[in-house]
Amino acid sequence: MNRIDKKFEVLKGEGRKALITFITAGDPDIETTYDIVLAIEEVGADIIELGIPYSDPLADGPTIQASSQRALNKGVKIPDIMRIVEKIRFKSDIPLVYLVYYNSIFKYGIQKFLKESKDVGIDGLIIPDLPLEERKDILEEADKYGIYLIPLVAPTSKERIKLITENGKGFVYCVSITGVTGAREDIETDIEEYMKTVSQYTNMPKAIGFGISTPEMAKKLKDFSDGIIVGSALVERIAKGYNKSEMLQEVKSFVSILKEVL
């Protein structure tokens, strides 16, 4: 059984929601990524998304774009990230998901990327710019390696939700707003109605992401989903320029507060 399925099964049995956290691999540097993953797992992260830095991240707002650029400026490349995931796997069995742009996979080589991801212990992929028309091909290849292709749906894509989710696995990433990622003070989408629509088409666990910046927002949205995804608000704390031990403490404090409300 894939680690993602196991995790949602355990959480359901405990009556809890998943805390899914996003960080950019290689920001502030690749070795610190290792420390951050272990630190946030320790205080309650259930699934961790590792963003593979990309020069033109269309789905990302300024916080994650800047984070991606910092990692690129450090020279972080896919082989470095594979190596650090392999290192994480010696210490941790937490579900790990790459958030990766399709062009990065294509340039690296689809087969090579999937094989290496499987070998180091990646459980799933979120590909925000994957055209629906090309989804089938990569889905078939990912299946061969036991890697889940996690569907990404948005409030504007009601007529496409069925198509997007029908072959997805793991969980549905439900984008809470139209536009790009980024911490927000409020979310204007009618979340209850939106999640009902998604539930009409799939029984997979559903996690809400984009714009969740505070424990209060997470608490407000948890009743409509099986999990909450927090990215930009966490990346902001990593980027604040603390020394390493202070940064890790700040990140752990934030994640533990989020976990408490779920």
From Swiss-Prot:
Cited Pfam families: Trp_syntA
Keywords recorded for this protein, A-Z: Amino-acid biosynthesis, Aromatic amino acid biosynthesis, Lyase, Tryptophan biosynthesis
EC class (word): lyase
Active-site residues, record numbering mapped to chain: 49, 60
Reaction it catalyzes: (1S,2R)-1-C-(indol-3-yl)glycerol 3-phosphate + L-serine = D-glyceraldehyde 3-phosphate + L-tryptophan + H2O
Gene Ontology MF term list: tryptophan synthase activity
Pathway: Amino-acid biosynthesis; L-tryptophan biosynthesis; L-tryptophan from chorismate: step 5/5
Disulfide cysteine pairs (residue numbers): none
Transmembrane annotation, as ranges: none
Cellular component per GO, a single term: cytosol
EC number: 4.2.1.20
Statement: the UniProt record of this protein carries the keyword Cytoplasm: no
Database matches in HAMAP family: Trp_synth_alpha
Family membership noted in the UniProt record: Belongs to the TrpA family.
Role this protein plays: The alpha subunit is responsible for the aldol cleavage of indoleglycerol phosphate to indole and glyceraldehyde 3-phosphate.
Quaternary structure annotation from Swiss-Prot or TrEMBL: Tetramer of two alpha and two beta chains.
Name the record gives this protein: Tryptophan synthase alpha chain
Name of the gene this protein is made from: trpA
